[in-house]
Amino acid sequence: MNIIIVDDDAFVSASLKIILESYSDITVLATGANGHDAISLYDTYIPDVLLMDIRMEGMDGLTASKEIITGHPDAKILLLTTFADDDYIIKAIRTGAKGYILKQDFETVASAITAVHNGQTVFGNEIMNKIPTLLQAEDRFDYPSYNLCLLYTSDAADDL
């Protein structure tokens, strides 16, 4: 599967590229450093999965995700960030990102990319633990996003 990595930390991008290219089924087409790069690279390559940081200079990953998904409704975007911030999680769900994992979970990145590529929505463990609380704050979600989130978390009901 073909992916693009976008992160403003060159060390993170380079490390992810090395790790992910060690898998025979993953090819890193390109790397970028901000949301503008993400949009341009996505339009150029149309990857199977876009792996992107949220907090970046110039244009953040959430804004870029929204713009990419507007132009490419089938885009599969997996957000990789240091922040398990409630507002970021809510915005990611509303934007239509297919996953949200923490950078501390490097060992799960390849499996998360594969899951997103296969049409699943992925949340890292720490994020997954927050979702029930976020869902209880119904007013923070519009109704369609609320339903989608319930659908995707229903498989993990034993963990709730």
Where do the PLM segments sit?
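Acidic catalytic/metal-coordinating carboxylates
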Residues: N34-D37, D60-T63
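Active-site residues of response regulator receiver
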Residues: D7, D53, T81
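Short amphipathic alpha-helix used as the core "switch/output" element in two-component signaling
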Residues: L62-D74
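Receiver (REC) domain active-site loop signature in two-component systems and cognate sites
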Residues: M56
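Short, flexible helix-to-coil linker/hinge segments that flank and couple to helix-turn-helix
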Residues: D87-I93, K103-L148
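Single conserved hydrophobic/aromatic residue that forms the stacking wall/gate
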Residues: Y152-L160
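Active-site beta3 strand of CheY-like receiver
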Residues: Y45-L51
